[in-house]
């Protein structure tokens, strides 16, 4: 009985000291001798914090949800469609990954862009870790921002004229070489992407019922690039590492269509060929791709604070390598992933989990003898 009471008292003392350590980590650094002459001391340990995924389209989340669950991390989705934001309250502790899409308005989520801007500004003002934060969301929402940033970094980009409003489109088109393409400044899914081989058909489009008005009233007129080999390439980057490159077949030409109408709607390529059929995949792993452009994209991501992105480029018939799009809201293609033997969602989950482990430390009891 005396021995049992002694053991109980020792255990109570340890539990009390552990509780006090949680309140005041400087309470004691003295090793504690437990039953069996084992000595325990307090040491720092990495403890994972919560991951929040900011988005506006739940249909794109399942692969990431599955990967995060498999990684064993605590996570929560944060849809920014409609809501409120208490600017006087601090944000929750955690890692925040923004998957806001430039095509959000096409799903009726017209408030999502500015909602996300506000939330990211709020998070960053409180020092929270944000993957693809405030600076990056501006690049996602504006192809002008992408174009100017890429050009400033020394990348070759397509000749482009930005037209603000509707009335000058036909006049400005006359300064373009034929053929040329149009696209929306705030796009995604190939919004507003069309090819024109003559000015008459362009004029008819602008004046006709099929004209697609850009949500931000900015239309880009851009040179048409003739791809050598009949494909375009996209390079995927996650957490400062090259994942893989994929190709999209353009052999049937480049009268372009929205990605949602193509064979692989989960692949958020900016350019998607009209030849897409429901029974085939136009997207494949580009095996053995080791071009120096990869390291340049990695450097660009580091410079701009981009954690996760896809860069699209065309190798032209006249020998140019032209980068035309940056997508910071990648949806990974299952056909490509099977061919490459690598999973984008899995590596995203591991990247976020590593950030979460780095963010928080705590002091725990560990045996020392």
Question: What is each residue range found by the language model?
Answer:
Residues 7, 17, 22-27:
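Intrinsically disordered, low-complexity proline-rich regions
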Residues 29, 34-47:
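Short, Lys/Arg-enriched N-terminal segments with co-localized hydrophobic residues
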Residues 49-52, 125-127, 134-231, 291, ...:
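Active-site nucleotide/adenylate-binding loops and adjacent lid/helix of ATP-dependent enzymes
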Residues 56-159:
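Conserved N-proximal alpha/beta basic substrate-recognition cap immediately N-terminal to
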Residues 194-301:
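Phosphate-binding site of ATP-dependent enzymes
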Residues 288, 302-306, 315-369:
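C-terminal active-site "lid" helix and adjoining low-complexity regulatory extension at the edge
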């Amino acid at each position: 009985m005396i021995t049992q009471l002694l053991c109980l008292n020792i255990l109570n003392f340890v539990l009390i000291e552990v509780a006090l350590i949680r309140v005041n980590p400087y309470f004691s650094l003295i090793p504690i001798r437990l039953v069996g002459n084992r000595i325990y001391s307090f040491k720092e340990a990495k403890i994972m914090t919560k991951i929040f995924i900011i988005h506006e389209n739940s249909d794109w989340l399942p692969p990431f949800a599955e990967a995060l669950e498999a990684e064993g991390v605590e996570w929560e989705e944060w849809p920014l469609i409609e809501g409120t934001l208490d600017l006087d309250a601090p944000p929750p502790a955690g890692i925040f990954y923004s998957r806001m899409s430039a095509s959000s308005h096409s799903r009726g989520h017209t408030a999502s862009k500015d909602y996300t801007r506000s939330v990211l500004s709020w998070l960053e003002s409180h020092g929270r870790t944000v993957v693809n934060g405030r600076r990056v969301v501006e690049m996602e929402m504006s192809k002008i921002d992408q174009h100017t940033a890429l050009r400033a970094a020394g990348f070759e980009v397509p000749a482009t004229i930005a037209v603000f409003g509707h009335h000058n489109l036909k006049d400005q088109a006359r300064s373009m070489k034929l053929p040329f393409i149009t696209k929306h400044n705030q796009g995604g899914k190939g919004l507003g992407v069309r090819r024109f081989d003559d000015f008459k058909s362009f004029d008819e489009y602008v004046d006709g019922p099929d004209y697609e008005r850009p949500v931000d009233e900015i239309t880009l007129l851009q040179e048409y690039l003739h791809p050598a080999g009949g494909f375009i390439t996209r390079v995927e980057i996650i957490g400062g590492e090259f994942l893989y490159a994929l190709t999209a077949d353009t052999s049937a030409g480049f009268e372009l269509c929205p990605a949602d109408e193509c064979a692989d709607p989960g692949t958020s390529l900016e350019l998607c060929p009209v030849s897409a059929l429901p029974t085939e995949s136009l997207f494949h792993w580009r095996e053995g791709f080791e071009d120096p452009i990869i390291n340049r994209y990695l450097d660009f991501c580091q410079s701009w604070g981009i954690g996760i992105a896809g860069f699209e480029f065309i190798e032209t018939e006249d020998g140019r390598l032209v980068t035309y799009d940056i997508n910071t809201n990648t949806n990974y293609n299952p056909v490509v992933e099977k061919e490459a033997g690598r999973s984008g969602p899995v590596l995203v989950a591991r990247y976020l989990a590593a950030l979460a482990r780095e963010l928080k430390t705590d002091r725990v009891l560990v045996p020392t003898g």
